[in-house]
Amino acid sequence: MTDVKNDVNVSSVVDADGLIEGNYDQVVESFDDMELKEELLRGIYGFGFEKPSAIQKRAIVPCTTGKDVIAQAQSGTGKTATFSVSILQRIDHEDPHVQALVMAPTRELAQQIQKVMSALGEYLNVNILPCIGGTSVRDDQRKLEAGIHVVVGTPGRVGDMINRNALDTSRIKMFVLDEADEMLSRGFKDQIYEVFRSMPQDVQVVLLSATMPSEVLDVTNRFMRNPIRILVKKDELTLEGIRQFYINVQKDEWKFDCLCDLYNVVNVTQAVIFCNTRRKVDTLTEKMTENQFTVSCLHGDMDQAERDTIMREFRSGSSRVLITTDILARGIDVQQVSLVINYDLPSNRENYIHRIGRSGRFGRKGVAINFVTENDARQLKEIESYYTTQIEEMPESIADLI
């Protein structure tokens, strides 16, 4: 597709706080009222959904009716199911060609999307291919030749498959960019633009982004036709049900002793521990192992097979404590996690909700504990102010709360 002309420049409808101004207020309160396929409804209810979330009430209908949609929403709002349901509704499962493409910033998120979409489409006989680096190109080519309806992938591998003529984009009717801000911040702009140019001129574009920096606005202005704009406000991305505490560790080098003390007090079912660097993840994992704590770790330097194994063990519960960087903070759904420890406060305040939202997602209760040095005091206050929340000093009775 080539650049399109819009009646409204989207950058003109973003306020000083970086929030997009919505232009669509139709709300559908029930999945039954969305005119979805019967088999798709079975998949939705079988997945465990009872009623649509705020973004699902607003975005599914315009997406299923072919409109271009920009949704400003973060992890934990139900956005993956929003575009998954929309794609499953729009595609013809009897046509064996690729009809929808979803791009995501990380392999883990792409795999998560594929799993959610497959579960929702359980009764539809739909073939969905995760198209990601670290896996066999030849296998992907074989599967595409055999017949795939939906491709979910990362920009690098998707672009590669298009260039090899393995991925035919000529019949794609719906193109979804998930976490567009994250993809662009990782330097994928050229690849994303190349993929856009390979699309049919009339392709429907759905873009989801937690923030609206200028790079995202450029994409919306160039490639989307008078899009419907939907904002799921910050206060709908609830921290409700998550008890948030901090421990004043004073110095960075005292964090490890503090973590060991916490282990002695708390019986951890499953926990995620976030560090800001890969090196710190490795160092902390080594120290914990030396001290007879069973932990696993995950970061971007690992190969795909290793990362898959670690995530599988953690999801199944055979691994109980996962030490990771922000690679896990966006979009990876680990249902059993009751405790999140920010060993380092996130360097980006937007990532705070991505990290701790994991512990209380979809109404589950959870506890988040932040290790705070003297240098972090101001940052902690900024996080409290940004989310209009309160982070209390950790009480001695913490074991009763987890």
Swiss-Prot record:
Protein name per its UniProtKB record: Eukaryotic initiation factor 4A
GO biological process, one term: cytoplasmic translational initiation
Job description of the protein: ATP-dependent RNA helicase which is a subunit of the eIF4F complex involved in cap recognition and is required for mRNA binding to ribosome. In the current model of translation initiation, eIF4A unwinds RNA secondary structures in the 5'-UTR of mRNAs which is necessary to allow efficient binding of the small ribosomal subunit, and subsequent scanning for the initiator codon.
Key word Nucleotide-binding present: yes
Positions that bind ATP: A73, Q74, S75, G76, T77, G78, K79, T80
Keywords: ATP-binding, Helicase, Hydrolase, Initiation factor, Nucleotide-binding, Protein biosynthesis, RNA-binding
Reaction catalysis annotation: ATP + H2O = ADP + phosphate + H(+)
CC per GO annotation: cytoplasmic stress granule; P granule
